[in-house]
Amino acid sequence: MKIAILSTKQELSSTQRLKEAALARGHKVKIINTLRCYMSLSQEKPTIHYMGKELARYDAVIPRIGASITFYGTAVVRQFEMMGTFCLNSSMSITRSRDKFRSLQFLSRKGIDLPITGFAHSPDDIEDLIQMVGGTPLIIKLIEGTQGIGVVLAETKKAAESVIQAFLGLKVNILIQEFIGETQGRDIRCFVIGNKVVATMQREARPGDFRSNVHRGGTTKLIKITPQEREISINAAKALGLNVAGVDLLRSKRGPLVLEVNSSPGLEGIENITKKDIAGMIIEFIEKNAKPIKAYSRYQG
């Protein structure tokens, strides 16, 4: 098969692992800079050009779309879909996952348990919003933040009001979330491929922080998840339409809660801790599912 990996930074570990895994299984693979793709639409056919030439057809595309280029990146993925190319995660599923509140709305509609979450526009509603999520302490998040950036723990009502007012004053979209204190800065990353959780790890925040992201200095260790945690992870990925996802869970007193669903989960940390060839599993999934399809048939707006 001919496989394209969409990535703006080909040196990234996850991108290289996917390339290695594809080559090891006998496929032709090319890393394509998403931002150097440019597109043409006409009555006859959609095309993608790359560095001065029309891009060759590929059997499958692996989108590694960074949060900062979601709009353009998903447009490129959508163009591949219109050309009939199998995309590991669809443009629609990536878009759903990137807007934190929108993704939680999808999960809530499917009956998936979440931390109580609020969203408001007017500063006049701050006091009621704080009460809606159970009061302080509470978490304040940028709707399009990643890797723990733009996540604030407000421990008092006064602090919460000040931070929320500051964000709203800057016309920044934020969501407010209940603080699950019993997790003690720990969460669980479940790596989902298709309808299966293929790897799990626990992440723990560094001392003095509450964010467990490895990019923020958090540590990881192996963990065994429960059947309920496995089921909720698979259902969360399915609710957003993702074939591959990193589902972050919290173990709360009322059971597992889905914190977030990542459409471009990193491979390095979880492969290192579990010693599993997750990149190889992704390529195997593509082999089983990348069948020739009619052009335009995957485009859903």
From Swiss-Prot:
User: What is the cofactor note?
Assistant: Binds 2 magnesium or manganese ions per subunit.
Keyword Transferase carried by entry:
no
Q: Which PROSITE patterns match?
A: ATP_GRASP (PS50975)
Residues that bind ATP: 141, 178-179, 187, 211-213
Q: Which cofactor does it need?
A: Mg(2+); Mn(2+)
> Which family does the similarity line name?
Belongs to the RimK family.
UniProt-recorded name of the protein: Probable alpha-L-glutamate ligase
> What broad taxonomic lineage does this protein's source fall under?
Bacteria, Pseudomonadati, Pseudomonadota, Gammaproteobacteria, Legionellales
